[in-house]
Amino acid sequence: MDETKEGSRGNAHPRAGDSDVYLLAAHPDWRESRVNKRLLAAARGVPGVTVNDLYAAYPDYAIDGPAEQERLAAARLVVLMHPIQWYSMPALQKLWVDDVLAYGWAYGPGGTALKGKDLWLVLTTGGQEEAYHPSGYNRYFFDAFLPPYEQTAVLCGMRFLPPLVMHGSHSASEQEVLDHVQTFAQRLGSYPDWPEIAELDAAPACEVPPSDRPDADDDADGVADVRHGMA
Ligand SMILES: Cc1cc2nc3c(=O)[nH]c(=O)nc-3n(C[C@H](O)[C@H](O)[C@H](O)COP(=O)(O)O)c2cc1C
């Protein structure tokens, strides 16, 4: 297999509406990937999953907001899959959030396009689980880095499903990587029949007051105000 091509194989611009799972895979350099590239290949083999390899789709960082919104609107589960970089998401994934989750569409007045959908994080880290501990070099439990993801979901009315995380991606054994990929594919393929889902509450309502917006008159047009940003 030509590993350099693995990440960008398939549709660079997937169509909306042919599945109810929309998976965004964001890896800045698939040639360097050990785990995410295998997760990506596994995701492509699961029926009903639309996969978007973000760095292949938008090498110029010019994200097609309306197309992304169409794919999101068609989905029931949105999956963000990426390596953790500087305790957060890769830059293009962050730009996608900035550009696509627009006021009046994803949140705020009339912003109900994502309400009732689920968000699932599939993350990898270089650091071992023990490093994410008050006595480790990352100083915090890994969960302490997740509230920005979780609150982004909740602000959009989405349920935040328990993330799937692989720590110590560089040092994990081959068998551990294979087992992880298998767990991931099994869960992706069996959504929404996950035991814990029935026990999750709907996202609590979060209203953004007009005073937190740059210009309240501009905003409530219900149209995707791509690139307006949050405040
Ligand atoms: C720019 C950059 C920043 C990174 N930041 C972190 C970090 O904050 N925490 C961590 O545990 N690993 C960090 N890593 C390591 C990656 O998370 C790790 O290489 C990746 O999860 C391995 O997955 P892959 O085999 O699919 O590339 C970073 C890597 C890069 C290149």
Where are the model-predicted features located?
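N-terminal beta1-alpha1 ligand-phosphate binding loop
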Residues: 2, 11-52
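Glycine-rich phosphate/pyrophosphate-binding loop and the adjoining helix
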Residues: 20, 40, 150-231
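Hydrophobic/aromatic beta-strand patches that form the interior of the parallel beta-sheet core
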Residues: 22-24, 52, 79, 120-122, ...
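Short, solvent-exposed amphipathic alpha-helices that sit
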Residues: 34-45, 141-156
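Generic recognition of short, well-ordered alpha-helical segments
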Residues: 34-38, 63, 91-95, 175
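A short beta-strand-loop structural module common to alpha/beta enzyme folds
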Residues: 48-62
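Structural motif
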Residues: 58-66, 172-176
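Helix-loop-strand module that forms the ligand-binding subsite of alpha/beta enzymes
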Residues: 66-150
